[in-house]
Amino acid sequence: MPLHHLTRFPRLELIGAPTPLEYLPRLSDYLGREIYIKRDDVTPIAMGGNKLRKLEFLVADALREGADTLITAGAIQSNHVRQTAAVAAKLGLHCVALLENPIGTTAENYLTNGNRLLLDLFNTQIEMCDALTDPDAQLQTLATRIEAQGFRPYVIPVGGSSALGAMGYVESALEIAQQCEEVVGLSSVVVASGSAGTHAGLAVGLEHLMPDVELIGVTVSRSVAEQKPKVIALQQAIAGQLALTATADIHLWDDYFAPGYGVPNDAGMEAVKLLASLEGVLLDPVYTGKAMAGLIDGISQKRFNDDGPSLFIHTGGAPALFAYHPHV
């Protein structure tokens, strides 16, 4: 894989070292299959999470452009917004967050606790909207208003999921390949598929580094018909910027996100409780709980290509647990 193409993109060091790749012995015994976990939940800033991988590239670009304000959007309990705000605070930048309430709840925990509480600690400027129906356009409108106030804004898309941001997960694929080289021959990788950047970056990287590994994206907000074009568009954009081909099919499972984005379901909450009780690992009700429910059910239903070792990408999100009480 031509690494020189990846290294030509400016990158701000935020993580510092590879995140752990760990064997989960008790979960493996429970499921009857070797299960490993990539611990992107333990990145070092503001209670961790995978978005730091994307922000390393996006914020480097913002600094290159001379920005003094980061603008992004998401749900009230967005992990991405929390991590963006934390990085802004760390670097002395202003952060403006455009937030929606996607589940329409009036529950105080959801509206004020978890990630939302942390945004206040980071001195984030909060702008509420009824719904993020066209987030790119809404962010641009907000950026124009902020610029008129004398700031130099840089727009970071929902989830950090642009081709540039997704370079963080091409790099993650390199990390995974190196960590697995002398430890385990992976058969499959499972990841939550939402704003699509994490999934697409892994798809490009793993196709060139571990082409025999089956990559499964478990959707957290959309059907396969809605999600697949989003992942493919980013996959092709990433590959184009890296001068690579991207021909791997995109595999998605959409059986585990109902009733909708941000709304807990029984299978997801059972997965959260299972990982906590067996391994002391905290998942969340929005992303990783539902993705782990997919992994567990996928093994039960024999949906994988074979029964070899599987790697679960833990993208973080535990701060949201406090917002979803009493579901937890």
Swiss-Prot record:
It comes from the Bacteria. Its EC number is 4.4.1.15. GO terms for molecular function: D-cysteine desulfhydrase activity. Keywords: Lyase, Pyridoxal phosphate. Its cofactor is pyridoxal 5'-phosphate. The modification N6-(pyridoxal phosphate)lysine is found at residue 51. GO terms for biological process: D-amino acid metabolic process. It catalyses: D-cysteine + H2O = hydrogen sulfide + pyruvate + NH4(+) + H(+). InterPro entries: ACCD_DCysDesulf (IPR027278), D-Cys_desShydrase (IPR005966), D_Cys_desulphydr_bac (IPR023702), TrpB-like_PALP (IPR001926), TrpB-like_PALP_sf (IPR036052). Homodimer. NCBIfam families: ACC_deam_rel, PRK03910.1-1, PRK03910.1-3, PRK03910.1-5. Belongs to the ACC deaminase/D-cysteine desulfhydrase family. This is D-cysteine desulfhydrase.
